[in-house]
Every structure is written in structure tokens, then in C-alpha cells.
């Protein structure tokens, strides 16, 4: 199992990036969460089989059709305490 904290920058707020992330992560069977940050980025935690987490990273580089992803910063972290994938309140 692999767990990554990802910070996505670019045109990623106001373009349905969080909703798309929830749907995509659930489709891959991942646990974790996604939220907007005050600095205009989106932050997400992905936990699951390595292949599924890597597939999610590839998907995040494209995002939904109206998004423009400029950068992904990826940090390995500890596994989340709760199952499932959710959208957290913005920070």
C-alpha cells in the first residue's frame, strides 16, 4: 500500500477539480480526501495499492476538462485513519 499527499497548482479551483478527484479516486478504490487551500492550490491524500495511487497521479496531471495543472508536489505520508474518500472543507 502507498500513501501520498499531493499539492496541485494551476487553474484548479472553481473548475470542479475536487468533485472530479472524489469520483476518480473512488473509481480507483482509493481512500483519502481532497480540499481547496487558501493559496489557490488543491491538496489531496491518496491511499491504496501502488498501481492505483500511481494511476491517480497520472490522472491528476490532466484533471477535469476546464482545469489547467501547472505542477504536482508529492510527499509520502502515513496512511489515513478512516476508510473511503471524501471532500474536506477548504483551508
UniProtKB/Swiss-Prot annotation:
Acylphosphatase-like domain sequence ranges: 3-89
Keywords: Hydrolase
InterPro entries membership: Acylphosphatase, Acylphosphatase-like_dom, Acylphosphatase-like_dom_sf, Acylphosphatase_CS
Pfam family, one: Acylphosphatase
Catalytic activity entry: an acyl phosphate + H2O = a carboxylate + phosphate + H(+)
Keyword Hydrolase belongs to the record: yes
PROSITE patterns, alphabetized: ACYLPHOSPHATASE_2, ACYLPHOSPHATASE_3
Active site per UniProt: 18, 36
SUPFAM superfamilies the record matches: Acylphosphatase/BLUF domain-like
UniProt-listed Enzyme Commission number(s): 3.6.1.7
GO molecular function, one term: acylphosphatase activity
Family statement: Belongs to the acylphosphatase family.
Entry-linked PANTHER family: ACYLPHOSPHATASE
Protein name stated in the entry: Acylphosphatase
Gene: acyP
Amino acid at each position: 500500500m502507498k500513501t501520498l499527499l499531493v499539492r496541485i497548482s494551476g487553474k484548479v479551483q472553481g473548475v470542479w477539480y475536487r468533485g472530479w478527484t472524489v469520483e476518480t479516486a473512488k473509481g480507483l478504490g482509493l481512500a483519502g480526501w481532497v480540499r481547496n487551500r487558501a493559496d489557490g492550490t488543491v491538496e489531496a491524500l491518496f491511499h491504496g495499492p501502488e498501481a492505483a495511487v500511481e494511476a491517480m497521479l497520472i490522472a491528476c496531471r490532466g484533471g477535469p476538462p476546464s482545469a489547467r495543472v501547472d505542477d504536482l508536489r508529492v510527499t509520502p505520508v502515513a496512511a489515513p485513519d478512516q476508510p473511503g474518500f471524501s471532500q474536506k472543507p477548504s483551508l
